[in-house]
Amino acid sequence: MKTLAIELRKGKRTGVIPVLLAVGVLGAAYAFVNFIVRKDTLLNLPLAQMDVLLTQLYGMIMVLNLFGIVVATCMIYNMEFKGSAVKKMYMLPVSVPAMYLCKFLILTVMFLVAIVLQNLALAQIGMTDLPDGAFEMGTLVRFAGYSFLTSMPVLSFMLLISSRFENMWVPLGIGVAGFLSGMALANSGLTLLLVHPFLIILKPAVAMSAQPDSTVALVALVETLLFLAVGLWLAKYRRYE
């Protein structure tokens, strides 16, 4: 708990917490504005109303989420490399793996808050603007959980990368390259390509149905835990030089 409290204070100073809150607010605002501008067009699409609400608005929200994750994960470790602070921690009564885990938990919780804010906006749109009886809260909750889970491999992967590179531009570059390569492969049906975490986060955005894909969800969970485990192992056994 002491390590978590310290990391929370660091998170406020580095701006990680405000960044992810801003992602949630901007995503919610985008959903409102987009639906207001394109309401008639969206409601006339040959799709179920809930599919329109969730899949047609999620694309830009996903981009905001992805770059919010990339920026936040880069920022959360940037402070640790200043003055070689992370190297000195091995000589202090501080568990570096515990610090890594706390950073992961802080990012996860704050990203979950962002997802909740965005989906509250979608819920408000659904209840007020969709035809009577078309809005389904259960479908919204499932899609929200699915979009959160499919974003976690990128969060876990980017935290791992950020923890190993002192120069913040390296993980930023990897994040941008990951997004571009994911976009290029987004419409591929090859299951093998799901090893690419930046492809998984795109799956809800390119789907025409709001129903979660169980295969994608399972791979997302496995990748999240795998990247987390690798990051914890490196924090414990591979000291910073």
Question: What do the PLM-derived regions correspond to, one by one?
Answer:
Residues 77, 86-89, 121, 125, ...:
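Hydrophobic alpha-helical interface/terminus motif in multipass membrane transporters
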Residues 1-24:
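Aromatic- and glycine-rich beta-strand/loop motifs that create alpha-glucan
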Residues 24-71, 101-165, 206-211, 215, ...:
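Secretory targeting signals
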Residues 19-25, 165-183:
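Pore- or pathway-lining transmembrane helices of multi-pass membrane proteins that form conduits
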Residues 67-81, 156-169, 224-237:
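Transmembrane alpha-helical segments in integral membrane proteins
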Residues 33-53, 172-241:
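Terminal transmembrane helical anchor/hairpin motif
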Residues 76-108:
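Helix-loop-helix units of permease transmembrane domains in multi-pass membrane transporters
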